Every structure is written in C-alpha cells, then in structure tokens.
Amino acid sequence: MATLLRSLALFKRNKDKPPITSGSGGAIRGIKHIIIVPIPGDSSITTRSRLLDRLVRLTGNPDVSGPKLTGALIGILSLFVESPGQLIQRITDDPGVSIRLLEVVQSDQSQSGLTFASRGTNMEDEADQYFSHDDPSSSAQSRFGWFENKEISDIEVQDPEGFNMILGTILAQIWVLLAKAVTAPDTAADSELRRWIKYTQQRRVVGEFRLERKWLDVVRNRIAEDLPLRRFMVALILDIKRTPGNKPRIAEMICDIDTYIVEAGLASFILTIKFGIETMYPALGLHEFAGELSTLESLMNLYQQMGETAPYMVILENSIQNKFSAGSYPLLWSYAMGVGVELENSMGGLNFSRSYFDPAYFRLGQEMVRRSAGKVSSTLASELGITAEDARLVSEIAMHTTEDRISRAVGPRQAQVSFLHGDQSENEPPRWGGKEDMRVKQSRGEARESYRETGPSRASDARAAHLPTDTPLDIDTASESSQDPQDSRRSAEALLRLQAMAGISEEQGSDTDTPRVYNDRDLLD
C-alpha cells in the first residue's frame, strides 16, 4: 500500500509538470506580420509631445488597421522611457510579429509637423500619410482630439513635467484596460472608473485629460484581440519590476496598476486556496477532498515552476491555464465558495453558475463557518503563545461579533414600534375577526371582546383605554371620512395591531433593565 501511495504521488507530480523546453527541434516560428512603431528620433520634449498627440488621434480612428493600431499603442506605451527603441528591442520576443522602428523628428514642411528621420530623403508625405493628415475620410473627431474636454485642441507642451503628467494620465487609462480586457470586458467599465477616481484623488493623473469612452473601447478591444500587444505589456511590467532602485513615477504607477492585472482569470484557483485551505477548517479531513487536495498541491507546485509569468498565464493565453480551472477540483471549489460567502461580503457578487458547482458542499462550507464561529485553533494558539484564558476571551468576543454580524445581515431590528395611520371613519365598523383576531388575543395574553360584541362606541372606548399614554394620535387623519371599505379595514387592522403591541409592552416587567426589541414583521405574519 505504501508503494501505491508513493507511485500515486509521483504520478500526480509528473502529470502536472510543464513541458520540458529542450528538444532536437528548433523554435517554432509562425508567419509574421510587420508592425511599424514610431519612436522619437531626438530628446526634444516637443517631438515627444507632438508624437503623443498624433498617436492618440491615430488610435481613435476607426479606419486604422489592426497592426497599425498595435504599433501606435506600443509607441505610446514606451514614450515614458529615455530610449524607447532600446526598450522595445530588449523586451520584444514574439514569434508572430516583426517590429520595425521608425524614428520621428520635427518638420515644418509636413501637415502633421513630423517626419521620418532619413538620410537626405524627403519623408514628409509618408509621415502625413501614416498619421492620416491627408485622408479626407478620417473622422472629424480624430482631427479635434478624443478627450472628454473638447476645449483641449492638442497636447503639445514644452515642459518636461507637464509632458510627464499628460503622458502618465493617458498611460494610466490604457494600462487599466488590461485588467479585464480578456477576462470580463463587458463589466470592465465600473472597475475602470473606480481606478480613475483613485488615481485622480492621488494626483497621479489630471482629470481634464480623461479620454472618451469610444477611444477606450477601441483600445480595450484591440488589447483583447491582439496577443502580441498583451505580450509586450506583460514583458514591460516584468522589466519594470526587475529594475533596481528608485523608478520613474510613471513606472511606479504601472506597478500599482499591476496589482489589478496579476492573476486575472485565476480567481477560482486563488480563492480556493484562500478560503478552502488557508482557513484550515476540519472539513478538509473528509475523504471526498483527498484527491482534490492532492491536485491542488500539484497545481501550486506547477504555478511556482512557471516563474514570473505564472500570474499572467490567462492574459498570455498559455494553454496550461486549463489545468487551474475549478473543474479540476469542483468539490473543494464549491466548499471554498461557501466559506468565502460567509466570511467576506465581497464574495456575494461572484457568479457560481457552473455545471460542476455542488450545492451540498457549498452549504458545507457555510455551516463550517457558522458552527466554528468563536473557536480558536489550538495549533495557532500554541504558536502565538495564547493562553487558555486568552483563548476563552477571544472566543467570547468572537461569538458576540458573529451574532451581531448575522443580525445585521438579516436586517435592522426596530427599537420602537411603528404603526400606520389610516383614513377611517369611526362610524364604519372594521372588518376583523377569525384567525387574525386570535393572534391578537394570544399576543396580549387576555380575553378581549370583539368589535361586533361591543359596538362602535364601546370598542372605541376600549381602544382608547388600552392605548399607551405617550402614543401620538393623528386626530385629523383619524377623523377623516373614507368611502373605501378596504381603507377602513386596513385602518382597523392597524389599530388592533397597535392594541396587541401595547398589551405586549404592558406585560413586560418593570425590573427589566433593557426593553424588549420588536420587529413589526413578526406581528404582520
């Protein structure tokens, strides 16, 4: 049996191992398409700001081809470094594209104000054609800019600080799109807006340079459909992370946005580890979880073997991502989702509609959290040096906290009795009796004469006698006559409920320190 278990463990490890990268054959190269990336040919801020302005206009043009749009976006993404050409050549390693760099310099003879650097060759016409300045079919909006603030005609500046602020604002909006461009493009607008508000409050971006939704949609769609562009963005993130020492402000902002990008599409795997394993509830000892726990262990080892690109496997369309889907460990995932829903309110918005979702193990996770509330782990207590007395105190506090949390989740309980003021005439008898009348009598604990036995005047006197002295009565409303019998019946029902609640309050002993809290819903059932 021991040999079988060792063989099983070895089999699981080898099954989930990544393929070995060595072999007799060379690297497989696909059919490449050419991507032209314009980069500044000098260190002038005017050249960079003018190039940024032209590329932003070019990106929003709906008639631009895919490779040309990718080249424009790569050019924008690399403008914040001192040598964009060296950066692009260093980090680009895509077997499906061939990147060609075109240096751009200022020109007074072209309509775009830019030209391609060349030795003695006039390239103004080619530059104007690239930036679509001689295309009459180009949209008017692309000529006037794509910012929400239409007063901004261009973004050409002479100041390096101003250029960095404008460039950082545009780059922040592009990088935020990567977070959900692949996994959830339909619901990305809300999260992107929250990121924008955050960076606006931190003064990292300038609110006036907010790009229009159409421009952002074009860029998001291009990021979603173009794998070489995503590979370049991931390679740029990793290159920034590997840079030692202090980084430029834009680079630090990209690293901050990266916290929303990493592990995109791996929520099932990460949350199963967080709520299913790290909580260490005794349910992990079930035999049903033994195989899936072994699977998760192999996946965690595989994740580490993949290195720094593991958190981006979904964005990079790595085929190994299918091994990390919840379908490989459905029972443990269902259990972890039940635990997560009970522990964190943010988990309530997750979509559990999967074919492998098991409601029984989902409820198991919920019950484990509820019944384990206030318990202290003996292992953790011994490691942290918590005494038995401290553990009892923690358990007591945790129990009260859990009860308060559950009561808030059910709904607020009212400290005062609220009742209705109906439009009722005293001359119209209320339609009341039967089962509802018995509820009122039982709640008061005493026999009362019904309205039919006492008549209108005696019933009115009885109601007045049993009403609390501090109960505010709306005399104007009560004296109004109504011709609708349903309104009269509802008014009478409300007054009888008030009698019942008044009787309950009279039965409370005067020695009670805290008054009893009632919920109107209990009396309305």
UniProtKB/Swiss-Prot annotation:
Ranges for region RNA packaging and organization of the helical nucleocapsid: 1-375
GO molecular function: RNA binding; structural molecule activity
PTM comment, free text: Phosphorylation at Thr-279 is required for the formation of the nucleocapsid.
Residue span of motif Nuclear export signal: 425-440
Binding site for RNA: K180, R195, Q202, Y260, N351
Span list, region Interaction with the phosphoprotein: 477-505
Signal peptide: none
UniProt subcellular location: Virion; Host cytoplasm; Host nucleus
Major localization class: virion
Chain segments carrying region Homomultimerization: 1-36, 373-391
Segments for region (Ntail): 404-525
Similarity section: Belongs to the paramyxoviruses nucleocapsid family.
Domain characteristics, as noted in the entry: Ncore is globular and carries regions required for N self-assembly and RNA-binding. Ntail is an intrinsically disordered monomeric domain in the C-terminus.
Subunit structure and binding partners: Homomultimer; forms the nucleocapsid. Binds to viral genomic RNA. N0 interacts (via Ncore) with the phosphoprotein (via N-terminus); this interaction allows P to chaperon N0 to avoid N polymerization and non-specific RNA binding before encapsidation. Interacts (via the Ntail) as N-RNA template with the phosphoprotein (via C-terminus XD); this interaction maintains the P/L complex anchored to the nucleocapsid template during the sequential transcription.
Protein name according to UniProt: Nucleoprotein
Organism lineage: Viruses, Riboviria, Orthornavirae, Negarnaviricota, Haploviricotina
